[in-house]
Amino acid sequence: MRTYDDIEYNYHEYPNNEVYITLGINIGVATRYFLIDSKEVYINNLAFANVFSNYMKLLLGERVIIDVGRTVTTIIYTADKSNWVNDFICFLNIIYINDIDVDLLKNALEGSKAKFERVYKDGEFRALYKSYEYADTNKGYKLHDLIENLQELNVEEFVNGYKKLIVSDNCSLFVNGNLSGISQKEREKIDNILKNITCTVALGGKLNNPLLKDNAHLFELSRQDVNMDILSFGFEKTVSMMDKMIYLLFETDKIPGYSKEIHLDEFDSSLIVKTEEVLKLQNYFKRPETSSQFDITKASLAGKYNQWIEENPIRFNMMVVEMRLNNIAYTELLDTMVKLQYEDYANIASKIRPIVTEAQIVMRR
């Protein structure tokens, strides 16, 4: 991987000769507070990322895949090897330079409301979005606020949010695939687009004392049975993002269940697991995993990442930009894991052991 002007490029041959242009933006379902230019506190509409996603789908068409997470929205634009640089420049112009298409935006607003109303009836979707209240409490997320915000969001508020948040300082770019050469002139064009807006943006929140966070249990009626377990990890402020990531990757691997969702940002760290039955998972974190568990996890993670880059570049690219937005370089993480020995890991894990709290959401017909 090579980096020019804060854009990371990775040459990898894929049989379809495609290039995967990936933009990660530090906005998501749970991003409420931002600090603009180190002085202005901006309160974001919680529905902004979902409406932005639908607007981009209407604007960019079939060649784009968009994923909206809790703090990161990822846009993957596929280009052909022969024309990827021109496509890349056009893509950046659409994101950063072109004016908002108001008619498309109105369609995106109405479509977002209709889609949310439809999926909200699904118990698993509702449980997941409800679980963020526990997992992302330090960022001020509430499901009720998201629902209200979606109804309140209008063109003027969206355009204002776009100008403040869709800027290069709040984004990460990663280009992966069958890359042909990029000239100095083309790099200058790209650099000029990215430097067109120079404000700084930082995700906001409040680091509450994890000792004050209680366990919780929520029961709701639903059209289907759902069991969801949420583990929240309260790290000390001095623990680095890299150490948090290593800890979460290794320690959560021993948790039973399916559809695990690990999340890490500056304010919250969590694991959300869908399980067959209601379980108590806190006890798994009373001590670091054993040497044999460590070896299995280490091999499993290396194999998974290698499989992603070979067979699932979209998933791989999403991981890379999300890590970059958390100031973690994928190559550094991989190098750290390769060199990491169990004795060193156990020592680090015992020192940074977080306070683990747990919530369960049970939905029954």
Kindly give the residue locations of the regions a language model identified:
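His/Glu-rich zincin catalytic helix
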Residues: 1-61, 163-255, 357-365
